[in-house]
Amino acid sequence: MNPNQAPATDRTGRYLEALLDRHLKDLKFSEVTRALRALSAGYVEKREEGGLARALDGRGKRAAFAWYYGATHFLATQALVRELDLGFSGTGRPTILDLGCGTGVCGAAWALESEAPTHVVGADRSSFALHEARWTYQTLRLKADTGRSITETLESIRRPEGIAIGWTLNELDDAKRAVIADRILPWVLKGSRLLVIEPVSKRVAPWWEEWAGRFPKERCSVLERRLRLDLPPKVALLARSAGLGADATVVRVLVAKG
């Protein structure tokens, strides 16, 4: 464990508490519940191009997105990094590139599960998401930078040691998914670790098999996992109140261990 960091479990707990305080400070629980129902129908189920920007059209929806999906995606990523032994150790400061970072939780969870100090680079087209990502990195005391353009970040960054793409590719069209695959494949072949996470439903991600098939089986594995989530009580209550899963999530994963 990095001697300058508190244990990951302690920092996770403090982060989730801070997330609750941040997004319930000026809103009622019932407001966030209604917003989460609307957000789930308007964004997660449709997942059309630009869906995030249009879906987050009010304080309640932004709070629901950052709080519920932030917590669930953080814990799911953390569980996968542990199970797949993707955490970084040793000397140096490996870079974790988080593409379509949203509120920053995937890259942050990976960094938190690493013994080595890391540098997270989060890229997202949403200004709201980047604002929340910067808060996430600061709250967890992680060295990090953010960029507004995924394409420009891919072009400018040197080969990162880790690449996280969590619940992101479904927001993009085929051409943009192809650009990402073409850019990161050489990195993976040179030893970068890769963690791609998407919903398991073929209806939600009909493009998955073709996209994942671009990566050689000798380097990458495709998995499906049902992850049990130890959500904080209020997040679990929010999920149940909105008719969403509170105990587990099912995902499909493309992973390369470097």
Protein language model annotation of sequence segments:
Residues 178-190:
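A short glycine-rich, Lys/Arg-flanked "PGG" loop and its adjoining helix->strand segment in the class I
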Residues 126:
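Conserved SAM/SAH-binding beta-strand->alpha-helix loop
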Residues 103-116:
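Conserved SAM-binding loop of SAM-dependent methyltransferases across substrates and taxa
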Residues 217-258:
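Class I S-adenosyl-L-methionine
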